[in-house]
């Protein structure tokens, strides 16, 4: 008897990456595969890892290359998420801090989008410090 699983073809990261249009995102995804192993999820345009050790809950690379000029010119394609509950009064501050901070209030999850995991860690660290009161914003910020 054939089961549903017999009809499913699992995509491999290497097969999907052959068709990616953005070389910078593709090269970074390949580097993450070497460092963290094959992704947990593979689609035509996204590779994601749900099991990279903290600080991230989830990391994913999308076949995109978004120009971003803060703090210096670079391109964004890697996303990292953490569970951080952001008080409502801080949301406007986060929105103005960087276009690369995304907050999902229903999941209480903050996502950083940048060009490296290091930059995402720094961004999420900033959010955590702001929420924990270690950073006090002023009107000039």
Regions found by a protein language model. Name each.
Residues 1-10:
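Charge-dense, intrinsically disordered terminal/linker segments
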Residues 14, 21, 25-141:
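A cross-family detector of function-defining hotspots
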């Amino acid at each position: 008897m054939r089961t549903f699983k017999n009809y499913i073809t699992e995509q491999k990261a290497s097969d999907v990456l052959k068709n990616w249009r953005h070389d910078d995102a593709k090269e970074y995804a390949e580097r993450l595969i070497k460092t963290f192993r094959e992704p947990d999820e593979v689609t035509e345009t996204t590779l994601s890892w749900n099991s990279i050790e903290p600080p991230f809950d989830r990391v994913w690379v999308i076949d995109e290359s978004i120009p971003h000029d803060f703090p210096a010119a670079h391109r964004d394609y890697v996303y990292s998420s953490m569970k951080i509950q952001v008080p409502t009064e801080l949301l406007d501050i986060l929105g103005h801090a960087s276009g690369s901070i995304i907050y999902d209030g229903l999941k209480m999850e903050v996502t950083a989008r940048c060009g490296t995991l290091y930059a995402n860690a720094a961004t999420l660290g900033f959010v955590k410090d702001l929420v924990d009161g270690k950073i006090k914003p002023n009107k000039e910020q």
